[in-house]
């Protein structure tokens, strides 16, 4: 859990992902199209990925634990929460407040 929190706090937007997960790719692409440069942590490519995946599953209360999106060091959630924020118009202000967007 400490590693997850430390990584999440290092950048404005952090996405914990799996390289073969289509929803992870979709969420990452959304942020890129909005002009955000997210830090993507590929759990299946990290030696401590399984440990982080278990910690994220506990935080999210579900499995699979990816994608897990943190904005401004806070857990936002997974695909459903990110898309809900985007469609309601609340994602961009959240990104601005976190310093991930300047415009």
Curated annotation (Swiss-Prot):
Subcellular location: Cytoplasm
Family label: Belongs to the glutaredoxin family. CC-type subfamily.
Primary location recorded for the protein, binned into one broad class: cytoplasm
Official protein name in the record: Glutaredoxin-C1
Alphabetical UniProt keywords: Cytoplasm, Disulfide bond, Electron transport, Redox-active center, Transport
Ranges for domain Glutaredoxin: 1-102
Disulfide bridge map: 21-24
NCBIfam families: GlrX-like_plant
Pfam families: Glutaredoxin
Function per UniProt: Has a glutathione-disulfide oxidoreductase activity in the presence of NADPH and glutathione reductase. Reduces low molecular weight disulfides and proteins.
Coiled coil feature spans: none
UniProt GO cellular component terms: cytoplasm
């Amino acid at each position: 859990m400490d590693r997850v929190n430390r990584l999440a706090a290092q950048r404005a937007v952090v996405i914990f992902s799996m390289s073969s997960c289509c929803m992870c790719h979709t969420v990452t692409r959304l942020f890129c199209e909005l002009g955000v440069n997210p830090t993507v942590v590929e759990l299946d490519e990290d030696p401590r990925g399984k440990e982080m995946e278990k910690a994220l599953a506990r935080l999210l209360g579900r499995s699979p634990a990816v994608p897990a999106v943190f904005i401004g060091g806070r857990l936002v959630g997974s695909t459903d929460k990110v898309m809900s924020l985007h469609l309601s118009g609340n994602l961009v202000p959240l990104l601005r407040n976190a310093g991930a967007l300047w415009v």
